[in-house]
Amino acid sequence: MGTPNDQAVLQAIFNPDSPFGDIVGLDLGEEAEKEVDEGEVFPRAQLEQSKALELQAVIAAEAGDLSTALERFGQAINLLPERASAYNNRAQARRLQGDVAGALEDLERALALSGGRGRTARQGFVQRGLVARLQGRDDDARRDFERAARLGSPFARRQLVLLNPYAALCNRMLADVMGQLRRPCDER
């Protein structure tokens, strides 16, 4: 019938309400999240100021003021240039502004600073995977979503199911069958 992973993907398609952890065969080797205690790495006053600037930036971005958001993220980065979170968040604002190259540059920096671990890395892999998917680079997207899924991202797990060619085929066949069932008998 297929590999255990293929069977797990089919299980996820036909039983979408099942938690991914309960799907036999879908073993992504989830890594325990190892979050660095930033309070031990960065001076407390600078860390608090950096977080406050990031919060201001997020609020500005949510209000649609991307230029202010980018300015605040830049200030947070200048304050603590070795802190991954601000790069990750600025990447999102840059992407929303249409600066995909700048977003990817920030994501690379965030992933390097995070060491590929923790919440910031999980978000960075998801963002980079989304950019790759939008650019039609599905293999790169799959690799990033796999890394994010191992770090505990349910969104990345759903993206992996959607990127699976068997899932795409099953979804297409299921849509065809459902379309036929919805048509009146005389049209079939």
From Swiss-Prot:
TPR repeats lie at residues 50-83, 85-117, 122-155. GO terms for biological process: tyrosine metabolic process. Keywords: Repeat, TPR repeat. Belongs to the TTC36 family. InterPro entries: TPR-like_helical_dom_sf, TPR_2, TPR_rpt, TTC36. PROSITE patterns: TPR (PS50005), TPR_REGION (PS50293). This is Tetratricopeptide repeat protein 36. It holds the Pfam family TPR_2. SUPFAM superfamilies: TPR-like. The keyword Ribonucleoprotein does not apply. The keyword NADP does not apply. It comes from Bos taurus (Bovine). The lineage of its organism: Eukaryota, Metazoa, Chordata, Craniata, Vertebrata.
